[in-house]
Regions:
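A short, basic N-terminal segment
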Residues: 1-33, 169-173, 177, 181-190
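Walker A/P-loop nucleotide-binding motif
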Residues: 38-55
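Residue-level preference for the first positions of well-ordered beta-strands
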Residues: 38-42, 104, 142-144
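P-loop NTPase Walker A phosphate-binding motif
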Residues: 53-64
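Short, well-ordered alpha-helix to beta-strand connector turns
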Residues: 101-103, 169-170
């Protein structure tokens, strides 16, 4: 039995009209939240289609404490700690382990790791492996990963092993929206 609190009418927790054009995704998410069951989602789509916004709203409506890993900031912090003295390296590893073992985790903007090097890709591959192992051992977890990459790009950037792990536990949701910023774009010509 899941320890997660069941949410009555989770749809009311989302902003009015939000993601109504993605009813399959939203209905699936709402079912999982209502039941209190663990969930793992991989949201893919172009920049600005609402992946991060939906992820944060999903987690907020659970009422649980959660960790958000912004890929770019997390990797820079990790690099800075690893390039400092010995004790900071152990702090970095300990912090990383704590975050990967949280009950609710959002990894935002996977594939936006800068610098985009083999070392960065290896690092994030290992993070996905750590989370995969934790999910396998502790069924009562929730994870959301957002990315602008599609499945083929994830395989090319990280590995087929990472994609295989994601496919085992994650519901993959493809957002077909265009950027909301483009919808609001006004170009004035002189």
């Amino acid at each position: 039995m899941s320890e997660f609190r069941k949410i009555q009418d989770p749809l009311s927790k989302f902003p009015k009209g939000y993601q109504r054009n993605n009813p399959n995704i939203l209905n699936h998410v709402v079912e999982r939240i209502e039941s209190g069951d663990p969930f793992h989602y991989l949201f893919t789509g172009v920049v600005g289609c609402g992946k991060t916004h939906l992820a944060s709203n999903i987690v907020r409506c659970t009422g649980e404490r959660w960790d958000l890993v912004k890929v770019i900031k997390f990797y820079h912090k990790y690099l800075n700690l690893m390039s400092s003295d010995y004790s900071d390296k152990w702090d970095a590893i300990g912090q990383q382990n704590t975050i990967m073992q949280s009950r609710i985790l959002v990894i935002d903007a996977l594939g936006d790791d800068k610098p985009s090097t083999d070392a960065a890709h290896d690092y994030f591959s290992s993070l996905i492996e750590m989370r995969y192992d934790y999910i396998y051992k502790n069924q009562d977890t929730r994870t959301i990963i957002t990315t602008n990459l599609d499945a083929k790009e994830i395989i090319n950037t990280y590995s087929s092993r990472v994609m295989d792990r994601l496919q085992e536990y994650f519901v993959i949701c493809k957002f077909k929206e265009t950027s909301f910023r483009k919808k609001n774009l006004v170009i004035l010509e002189a």
